[in-house]
């Protein structure tokens, strides 16, 4: 289910959050984390680069509470999570996209049931440009025409210069330099599906190994444009407001707009786990996820620049996990 439909169903309102809010608000109805006893052992996480900082920060908090826990984190990209979970080489599979059917089938073929997707944060996938770029906003059709070779979203012409996007003066003839993620990345897959209408990327997109690399590359290129999770924003870049179609209002990538579904590139971030039906999770995994879905865990989400879960989403996940 897409984020906007779920949020509409929950009728969640981000109380007290203005349109220009830079700091996400914690839902006061989120549960407090209660420390358990006897939690120790080894926990491994393999998956998303987008979630790398979050997983590390959650791991640090978890180890503070449980010093006898050792946590290993590998963050090469979302596509590394499904095989690691299926092969049993990881307990946790952080992903910035949902698993594909073929990934679910491989897991189900081995275990007889599907892995459980746990929503852990909300992300606004942002379009970044250099801080000195005067562009005010882009339509989703323009975004497709910038990054795609196929233009399946409906744009009638390619975008090769900033003049093609309406900039004038010295900017008009400047070529657009593209930065993005590689195909192992869940962000790559999500952007391909949602922003390119399942089309193909241009061959001249400079593929970067991580989200931070995309933002850093854009910050060093006056002509640059790239896509990455909002949590990687720095002072050297700015994000571009997006409109769903020509003539529609440009929408900023803030908490309120991500949660109410008006921002076009809102998504859940997930941690997948191997939970057998009618069997409790191992205490190591259970307490980690319980921490992540608590006020304490969601404060970490805010600290890392992402958007915390509404309490109703966290409650649903807690119930499904039997925590």
From Swiss-Prot:
Pfam families: PBP_like_2
Regulation: Arsenate, pyrophosphate and polyphosphates up to 15 residues long inhibit phosphate binding, while organic phosphates do not.
Knockout consequences: Decreased phosphate transport. In PAO1, decreased ability to adhere to and disrupt a layer of human epithelial cells. Hyper-swarming in the presence and absence of phosphate; hyper-swarming is usually seen during phosphate-depleted growth. Increased induction of alkaline phosphatase in the presence and absence of phosphate. Double phoB-pstS deletions act like phoB deletions.
Induction: By phosphate starvation (at protein level). Different strains have widely differing amounts of protein that can be sheared from the cell surface, in order of decreasing quantities MDR25 >> MDR1 > PAO1 > MDR13.
Cysteine-cysteine disulfides: none
Gene3D superfamilies given in the database record: Periplasmic binding protein-like II
GO function terms (MF aspect): phosphate ion binding
GO cellular component, one term: periplasmic space
InterPro entries associated with the record: PBP_domain, Phos-bd, Phosphate_ABC_transporter
Secretion signal span: 1-24
Chain coiled-coil ranges: none
Biotechnology: Can be used to remove inorganic phosphate from water, which could be used to control growth of microorganisms.
Family statement: Belongs to the PstS family.
Main function: Binds 1 inorganic phosphate per subunit with a KD of 0.34 uM. Required for phosphate transport. In strain PAO1 implicated in host cell adhesion; in some virulent strains (e.g. MDR25 which expresses very high levels of this protein) antibody fragments against this protein decrease host cell adhesion and increase transepithelial resistance of human epithelial cell monolayers. Its ability to bind phosphate may allow it to acquire phosphate from its host.
Protein name in UniProt: Phosphate-binding protein PstS
Organism, scientific name: Pseudomonas aeruginosa (strain ATCC 15692 / DSM 22644 / CIP 104116 / JCM 14847 / LMG 12228 / 1C / PRS 101 / PAO1)
